[in-house]
């Protein structure tokens, strides 16, 4: 018998067959988890951008509709210890010694009506109308035909020189156009 048939047969490149198998990389094993996390982050970012842009749109719409109400810091002290003066009036609900009480309604200003004609400026038109400028014109025309508007005189000369910004400050609500025109 030949001993050839009983000899084990070894492959020529025995080292290649017994080389250790490398483990898969981190990305290949967790690829789907990483992709899902990226998609979720993108969705969250898109939702946040949408929410903030809608807030900006709502704020812009509120400015356009002129519905913004500003707080009057002088409202509580506005009529505290004020003595009534001839030719001026206070709003309903305002008392002379009510420090700490909020004043309701729009206060009347001490601004005298001018002899200038009414312009197309909505802020000054409203201020003149609040002081009785155009409303006093018919009464003034009958009393003094040459003077279309009456001039209110008060004892307090500082109130006669009140600016338009101070008049706006005394109001409870302002519109966007009021603020633009007061600058």
Curated annotation (Swiss-Prot):
Low complexity bias: start-end ranges: 130-143
Span list, region Interaction with host DYNLL1: 149-161
Cellular localization per UniProt: Virion membrane; Host cytoplasm, Host cytoskeleton; Host endoplasmic reticulum membrane
Pfam families (UniProt xref): ASFV_J13L
GO biological process: microtubule-dependent intracellular transport of viral material towards cell periphery; symbiont entry into host cell; virion attachment to host cell
Keywords: Apoptosis, Host cytoplasm, Host cytoskeleton, Host endoplasmic reticulum, Host membrane, Host-virus interaction, Late protein, Membrane, Microtubular outwards viral transport, Transmembrane, Transmembrane helix, Viral attachment to host cell, Viral envelope protein, Viral release from host cell, Virion, Virus entry into host cell
Listed transmembrane segments: 32-52
Membrane topology: Single-pass membrane protein
Bias (Polar residues) ranges: 111-122
GO cellular component terms, semicolon-separated: host cell; host cell endoplasmic reticulum membrane; host cytoskeleton; membrane; viral envelope; virion membrane
Location of region: Disordered: 81-157
Induction: Expressed in the late phase of the viral replicative cycle.
InterPro entries named in the record: ASFV_p54
Transmembrane helix keyword on record: yes
Function text: Inner envelope protein involved, through its interaction with host dynein, in the intracellular microtubule-dependent transport of viral capsid toward viral factories. Seems to induce caspase-3 activation and apoptosis. Plays a role in virion morphogenesis by recruiting and transforming the host ER membranes into the precursors of the viral envelope. Involved in virus attachment to the host cell.
Assembly mode: Interacts with the host light chain cytoplasmic dynein DYNLL1; this interaction is critical for intracellular microtubule-dependent virus transport toward viral factories.
UniProt record similarity statement: Belongs to the asfivirus envelope protein p54 family.
Protein name (database record): Inner membrane protein p54
């Amino acid at each position: 018998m030949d001993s050839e048939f009983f000899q084990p047969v070894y492959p020529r490149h025995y080292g290649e067959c017994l080389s250790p198998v490398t483990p898969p990389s981190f990305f290949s094993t967790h690829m789907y988890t990483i992709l899902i996390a990226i998609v979720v982050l993108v969705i969250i970012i898109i939702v946040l951008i949408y929410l903030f842009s809608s807030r900006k749109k709502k704020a812009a719409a509120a400015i356009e509709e002129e519905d913004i109400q500003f707080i009057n810091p002088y409202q509580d002290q506005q009529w505290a210890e004020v003595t009534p003066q001839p030719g001026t009036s206070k709003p309903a609900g305002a008392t002379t010694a009510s420090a700490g009480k909020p004043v309701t309604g729009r206060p009347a200003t001490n601004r005298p009506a001018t002899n200038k004609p009414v312009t197309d400026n909505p802020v000054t038109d409203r201020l003149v109308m609040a002081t009785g400028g155009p409303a006093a014109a018919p009464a003034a025309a009958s009393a003094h035909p040459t003077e279309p508007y009456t001039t209110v005189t008060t004892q307090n000369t500082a109130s006669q020189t009140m600016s338009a910004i101070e008049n706006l400050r005394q109001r409870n609500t302002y519109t966007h156009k009021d603020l633009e025109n007061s600058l």
